[in-house]
Amino acid sequence: MRPLKSLLAASVLLSGCNGMPVASYKDPAQEQAFVVHSGCPLALMLMGSAVQWNEDYAVTVKHLPFVSGSEYQGRGDVQFFRHKADKALPAWRNFRPGESLTAVGFNAFYLPMQGQGQALSALVRLDAKDGGVMYGTHDGPTVVGMSGGPVLAADGSVVGINVANLSRRDLESIKRADLSGHQQISIFLPYLQIQREWQRFATQQAHLKGVPNPVHLPIASID
């Protein structure tokens, strides 16, 4: 697949509307997402969503700055930050094209939101300088604030985190045949890419004297 130099400019890092997700007050799927804020010097000025990764770390997007407890920012739009699990860990796995997905998170008014769609086979790149990180796509809606929240499969597994969205005008401008015909597209970082970033973090930590290697911290997975 050819690099999409225009995709970064066209994509919106969940700073605009992509269809209309619905509020989800009592849906069990919403329990996996929680709100995270920017820290100093922008304390509480910016917000996003996050999901637990293992007993000691949670994961959100890198474009949310100054997250308290952040210890590693990956090549892709992802960062790991210290956050103790307070409930059962989610199961993680790779997504499957064609399966039903639900994007979960919170909007700018702190209301729980979710948008349902179908996983597409199309993969995209957001930045030619990120080492070739590939992002998944689905046709469900997302809104500002959901960035970093989990993307769930029908079996309850987390298959990635919300990152960005593309409007119909964006899709027309990039001229991707495999994305044509959609009113909007949401972009997420798949589990496989998140796991690769975690392994890079583990390798980095293993070379720091006196710092425990986080690779031994388990994550729940059904793969």
Regions inferred by a protein language model and the residue ranges of each:
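C-terminal motif of bacterial Sec signal peptides marking the signal peptidase cleavage site
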Residues: 14-16
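Sec-dependent signal peptide recognition
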Residues: 2-10
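Mid-chain, structured segments of secreted extracytoplasmic proteins
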Residues: 66-91
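C-terminal cap/linker of serine protease catalytic domains
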Residues: 19-25, 86-89, 163-223
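A conserved glycine-rich beta-strand in the N-terminal activation segment of trypsin-fold
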Residues: 30-61, 67-73, 148
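Terminal peptide-recognition signature
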Residues: 56, 60, 81, 98, ...
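Flexible, gly/ser-rich surface segments that form the specificity/activation loops bordering the active-site cleft
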Residues: 88-147, 162-174
